[in-house]
Design a protein with these regions (language model features):
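Short, flexible loop/hinge motifs at secondary-structure junctions
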Residues: 1-153, 224-225, 355-356, 360
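Catalytic center-proximal scaffold of phosphoryl-transfer enzymes
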Residues: 1-7, 11-15, 69-74, 132-134, ...
Length: 499
């Protein structure tokens, strides 16, 4: 039975093979592929025709809409305001034609411009329609000028945005890359390089005002100074920069200057040698200024710094430190009494001579008695060295019955009532530099130092004189926008904050 089944299967396979052969014979024969080298030249390189891609049909509801930002100004953008601008009489006077304003007639053609105007928190799109006028003689053809509050020279941003970028970077210690991220969250894509250009352009415009403020500060009778450092991103130039502030408390003016290397000669430039006093916190470069030839200012050292040194001794020499702190507190009580009673300079000086002088002598007596017994390199020894100078010089002068030079600098405030007993006003103004170190860590390059110093000078003067810096900057940019060259001195004096 198995043999019979096998023979039947073999027969079926043969029948199927014959049927397949018949089907294959009926099919057309396949063309053999010939290599390109055997083909004729006309058939070797045939231009390949690309198939045209059919555009996808999109529903009208799903069409991509333009972002509501001023950086893609097209027909889909929402216009917030429309202004119609006309030719002014000043334009007619500046033209070469001798025709009067009444001789000009309007032309039907109008130019349209779109501007991005910064309003606190967002941009507003303003569309301007510029009217055109032509004189009867046909020599001049005038077009309405864009107002200064909409656009600045060589910039597509308005003065308000320039002022906002400057204040965020200088006063709010907000680096440019953070400003870029903040604007991106609001829906505006502005690069860091663009923000940097706006900052430098703002500093270039207000540079004459900053120089005028520094010139006035250097002539002050009493000058408060202090310095700080900030790192530089470019290590090839230098690693650190010194930024110094000079304050005229009487006129509420301050001037910032920066140096790559801070020397006594550099600092001497900052103050007029005909002035009387300069206040500082016993920095070595300031003390060297007293030995420069032709320098006439007397140095007054800050008692608040001496008080901090004494305060650090409370854990180690409690009774000694508390005794000195109470005496320094009495000095401040004398100043507070004179301020509350609005005493004149003469009466204020008499009060210092009668009370403060005796207190300073008692402080000197306690410090000189403990100097010899203090252990070298201890905190007590370093505090007395800060007040009286080195021990060798002090011992030589004490034998002669003279007082050290450093202590005489601490007592300079007894000579004139205009001198404050501390240097806190300049330290408060320099506090922003510490904020910069926490937020941005460094400044980009050495060339950017005058940019920051100029902006610091004008903005901190606004704070001293209780002037809104944002509104002041906008007003200055609008007024100086029309000047191509440097403005005259009269206008610069009027634009100083508070004038």
């Amino acid at each position: 039975e198995l043999k019979r089944e096998n023979t039947e299967i073999k027969l079926k396979i043969k029948i199927l093979q014959k049927k397949l052969d018949l089907v294959l014979k009926e099919l057309p024969p396949k063309k053999k592929k010939t290599p390109s080298s055997l083909k004729p030249k006309s058939e070797r390189f045939r231009p390949v025709k690309k198939k045209k891609k059919q555009a996808k049909k999109v529903k009208s509801d799903s069409l991509p809409k333009a972002k509501n930002t001023p950086f893609c100004l097209n027909h889909n953008i929402k216009i917030d305001e429309i202004r119609i601008l006309d030719v002014t009489e000043e334009q007619v006077l500046q033209s070469n034609c001798s025709c009067t304003f009444d001789d000009y007639y309007t032309v039907n053609k109008q130019d349209e411009t779109t501007h991005r105007v910064w309003v606190p928190g967002h941009f507003k799109v303003v569309k301007c329609k510029h009217k055109k006028k032509k004189c009867k003689c046909g020599q001049s053809y005038l077009r309405a000028i864009t107002p200064a509050d909409l656009k600045m020279n060589s910039s597509s941003f308005n003065p308000a945005f320039h002022a906002q970028v400057s204040i965020d970077r200088i006063l709010n210690a907000m680096p440019l890359y953070r400003q870029k991220e903040h604007l991106k969250r609001l829906g505006y894509s502005i690069s860091k390089q663009t923000l940097g250009k706006l900052l430098h352009r703002s500093a270039y415009i207000i540079a004459p005002i900053a120089n005028k403020i520094r010139e006035q500060v250097s002539k002050a009778a009493v000058l408060a100074t202090d310095g700080s450092h900030i790192s530089i991103f470019n290590p090839e130039q230098c690693k650190k920069k010194s930024i110094w502030v000079h304050v005229d408390e009487e006129n509420n003016l301050c001037g910032f200057l920066g140096f790559e290397f801070t020397t006594a000669e550099d600092l001497a430039i900052l103050s007029d040698p005909n002035g009387k006093f300069i206040i500082n916190d016993a920095q070595a470069n300031i003390l060297k200024m007293s030995h420069l030839p032709g320098y006439k200012r007397l140095i007054a050292l800050c008692l608040a710094h001496l008080r901090r040194k004494i305060y650090d001794l409370l854990d180690y020499h409690h009774q000694f430190a508390t005794n000195l702190l109470t005496k320094i507190r009495k000095l401040y009580e004398v100043e507070c009494l004179a301020k509350n009673k609005n005493l004149s300079l003469e009466k204020h000086l008499e009060l210092r001579q009668n009370i403060s002088k005796n207190i300073m002598e008692s402080i000197y007596k306690t410090l000189s008695e403990t100097y010899a017994n203090a252990a070298p390199q201890s905190k007590l020894y370093k505090m007395i060295q800060y007040a009286l100078g080195t021990f060798k010089k002090f011992k030589v002068l004490d034998e002669k019955g003279e007082k050290p030079e450093r202590w005489l600098f601490f007592c300079t405030f007894l000579q004139d009532a205009r001198i404050p007993i501390d240097n806190n006003i300049s330290e408060r103004l320099l506090r922003i530099i510490a904020k910069w170190r926490d937020s941005s860590l460094w400044i980009g390059s050495l060339q950017s130092l005058p940019v920051y110093c100029d902006l610091l000078t004008v903005l901190k003067t606004c704070e001293l004189r209780s002037v809104n810096p944002l509104l002041w900057l906008q007003n200055v940019f609008i007024k100086l926008n029309s000047f191509r060259g440097p403005p005259p001195d009269d206008i610069i004096l009027d634009l100083i904050p508070g004038n």
